[in-house]
Amino acid sequence: RNKFDKSIILTNSDILINSDLADIYTFHEKKKYDITLVASSKDFTIPYGVCQIDNKGYLKSVVEKPTYNFLVNTGLYILNPKVLKLIPKNKLYDITDLIMDVKKAKMKIGAYPISDKSWIDVGQWTEYKEATKKLNSY
């Protein structure tokens, strides 16, 4: 809790990120964020036709296998030391809990966007296989 006097980098254990951490850290400090969440654009295709209905239940349209784009959390964060004081002792407490508590405290949270090609979540089987292929090519 009181062991850090500078912002720290926190990362999930199942991600690989190919991005300049110094740039992310500088962005965090320059913007004076209490938390910076590194985010990436990710496309998700629904493997079915998606039905859209009106408020009376009538079918308006069917969109076949649409692709949606979301800004997703990569699992890499920069934390200002003062947010660490919000973490309760001896209690299971997720990073999303901390983010919500920081928001409730009206502290500043920002997002640093990176390319979808810049990170892999090896906790996902398909991405793990892709990471293995890439790492074996070196």
Where are the predicted features?
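Active-site nucleotide-sugar/metal-binding loop of Leloir-type enzymes
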Residues: R1-S7
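Short beta-strand-centered segments that line the small-molecule binding cleft or hinge
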Residues: P47-G49
